[in-house]
Design a protein with these regions (language model features):
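Loop/turn elements at helix/coil->beta-strand transitions in domains of secreted/extracellular proteins
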Residues: 1-2, 54-58, 108, 148, ...
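Glycine-rich, small-residue loops and helix-cap segments
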Residues: 4, 56, 119, 161-162, ...
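Charged, often glycine-rich, active-site loop that binds/positions anionic groups
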Residues: 16-23, 187-200
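Sec-exported extracytoplasmic/periplasmic mature domains
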Residues: 52, 117-124, 170-174, 194, ...
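Short glycine/serine-rich loop/turn segments
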Residues: 1-102, 127
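A short helix-breaking turn/cap at a secondary-structure junction
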Residues: 81-165
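Short connector loops at secondary-structure junctions
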Residues: 175-189
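Short helix-loop capping/hinge segments that flank enzyme active sites or metal/cofactor-binding pockets
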Residues: 144-151, 195-263
């Protein structure tokens, strides 16, 4: 381990309209391809920047929804959000135990696969953890995609970089099938994150932090930040303030989670109907 990096504070679930890559502790992370010209992406901002700037061969990020993929795209590196449970989340600051995971980021698919290989494994301290075989870089030395079918949303086909990638895949033997993205409204997505973080963060504080810290709950954190908002929360803390008032029963939570899973599975129907590998 070479070191830690500066990330978007509280996994970018702390404030509204605040810049990606900012934390009160580390300040503003900058994109090495254009400081203050291009965004860093987030929330794993420093992980993407560190790899792009050659500070490290690879880095680890965490993702609930987009926090590995976003900074990977913004910094031109390869990022992977693994299946939840394949990598232990023990010790990770949570947004959502339903959706959180750690994941690898590197400059190439091979390096990302090698790091993924090193990260997977069962951990009894993570209730979602399962034993996954570390075989992620096997077969990457071959260039053929013969017999494989890949789907692409029609709206992305006109992007010049996507076109280049699709042409390379076709040359390697892949079949590319374009389709219109399903129209899915994830109305309860923020509600799910709110419920999970309201429940999961106090558990993390109790289990994994210094016992001398002056807070045990999200409300304590909000009040602590108010003591010096210019230092601790210069862009506000709207999300955390909202979380203080979240009060939903376990039955409502389970119903919300089931609804989200049902909507997500609509994408699997498309994959099955078009006979796609990915």
């Amino acid at each position: 381990i070479l070191g830690k990096v500066n990330l978007s504070e509280w996994a970018y679930y702390f404030c509204q309209d605040c810049p990606l890559g900012y934390s009160a502790l580390g300040g503003q992370t900058l994109n090495p391809y254009g400081r203050k010209i291009f965004e860093t992406g987030g929330s794993s901002s420093g992980s993407g920047v560190a790899v792009a700037a050659n500070y490290s061969v690879a880095a680890i990020g965490s993702e609930t929804s987009g926090s590995i993929l976003s900074p990977s795209g913004k910094n031109s590196v390869v990022g992977l959000k693994p299946t939840i449970g394949s990598i232990s989340r023990n010790g990770m600051i949570p947004i959502s135990s339903s959706l959180d995971t750690a994941g690898p980021m590197a400059k190439s698919v091979m390096d990302t696969a090698i790091l993924m290989n090193a990260l997977v494994g069962f951990d009894s301290n993570d209730e979602y953890s399962y034993n996954s075989e570390p075989v992620f870089y096997q077969g990457l030395d071959t260039v053929t995609l013969e017999g494989k079918s890949f789907g692409i949303f029609k709206k992305y086909e006109k992007d010049s970089l996507v076109k280049i990638s699709l042409d390379l895949m076709r040359k390697a033997g892949a079949k590319i099938i374009s389709f219109k993205a399903p129209e899915i409204e994830l109305q309860n997505f923020i509600k799910l994150l709110d419920i999970d973080m309201k429940n999961d963060l106090p558990k993390y504080i109790k289990k994994s932090t210094n016992k001398k810290l002056p807070f045990d709950s999200i409300n304590d954190i909000v009040n602590f930040n108010k003591m010096d908002s210019l230092l601790h929360a210069p862009y506000g803390q709207e999300n955390f303030t909202r979380l203080v008032n979240v009060n939903i029963s376990q039955n409502q939570f389970r119903k919300t989670k089931c609804e989200m899973m049902k909507l997500a599975k609509s994408y699997f129907k498309v994959i099955k109907n078009l006979n796609l590998d990915a």
